[in-house]
């Protein structure tokens, strides 16, 4: 009931009345913006899908986004493998340390799984099929893996991991940037918690979460003001 009546449009960001203000982030980048609309009109020629089909279009967009994020981002496995092969530890090269090798083996297996999952999804796309909820797996695994690898790489380097200037140490700076970027990957396109629910309910067929608002329109949901 909540999704009826929603219609999606695309907007030319150069349209009159559109103001974009970059948001300065803690890591110094501006990957997000505030967008203000002043008397902006969008013609029907910029409608996506049918009238009332906005929710369907939004879900299709999100599924494609999750597929792109899960299959397109670098999880950092090539970087951590290269680091382990060249980084000296007190006991020898990092790659020879059993604890490091165990981590690398785990991440290699996950990387192979992501690659094969992405290949199945791309095969389905080539046949004109719409990405399904199973593509949430790739995005969920890739985001967590990226963050875990970045943290481990920094710990492995010790004080050397604090270097952020690519002119001094390019690989260390890349890992720093990866660590700063990784929390956003676990939020954009659907948080880890949302994706776990999708996988549980729509892929594994587990019971849905209890919801008091299920089947009710927004204006029918009880609130403190309606009492």
Residue ranges and their predicted role:
Residues 22, 61-67, 100, 126, ...:
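Short beta-alpha connecting loops at secondary-structure transitions
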Residues 1-85, 206-227:
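FAD-binding core of flavoproteins
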Residues 2-6, 94-102, 171-176:
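Glycine-rich, flexible loop segments associated with nucleotide phosphate handling
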Residues 6, 32, 52, 111, ...:
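Active-site lining segments that contact anionic ligands and/or coordinate catalytic metals
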Residues 50-51, 96, 171, 187:
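Residue-level signature of the cytosolic catalytic core of signaling kinases
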Residues 16, 55-62, 81, 116-120, ...:
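Short acidic (Asp/Glu) and glycine-rich catalytic loops that position anionic groups and cofactors
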Residues 68-129, 133-152:
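Extended amphipathic alpha-helical segments enriched in small hydrophobics
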Residues 136-227:
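Alpha-helix capping/hinge segments and adjacent helical runs
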């Amino acid at each position: 009931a909540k999704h009826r009546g929603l219609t999606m449009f695309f907007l030319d960001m150069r349209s009159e009345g559109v103001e974009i203000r970059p948001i300065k982030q803690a890591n110094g980048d501006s990957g997000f913006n505030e967008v203000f609309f002043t008397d902006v009109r969008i013609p029907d020629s910029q409608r996506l899908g049918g009238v009332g089909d906005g929710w369907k279009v939004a879900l299709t967009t999100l599924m494609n986004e999750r597929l792109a994020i899960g299959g397109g981002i670098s999880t950092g496995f090539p970087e951590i493998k290269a680091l382990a092969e060249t980084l000296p530890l007190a006991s020898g090269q990092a790659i020879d340390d059993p604890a490091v090798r165990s981590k690398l083996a785990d991440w290699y297996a996950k990387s192979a799984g992501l690659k094969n999952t992405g290949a199945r999804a791309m095969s389905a796309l080539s046949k004109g099929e719409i990405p399904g909820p199973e593509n949430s797996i790739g995005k969920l695994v890739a985001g967590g893996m990226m963050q875990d690898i970045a943290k481990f790489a920094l710990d492995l380097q010790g004080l050397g991991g604090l270097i952020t200037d690519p002119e001094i140490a390019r690989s260390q700076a890349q890992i720093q940037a990866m660590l700063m970027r990784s929390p956003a990957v676990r939020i954009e396109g659907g948080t880890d918690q949302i994706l776990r629910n999708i996988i549980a309910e729509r892929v594994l067929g587990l019971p849905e979460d209890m919801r008091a608002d299920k089947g009710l329109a927004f204006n029918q949901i009880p609130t403190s003001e309606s009492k």
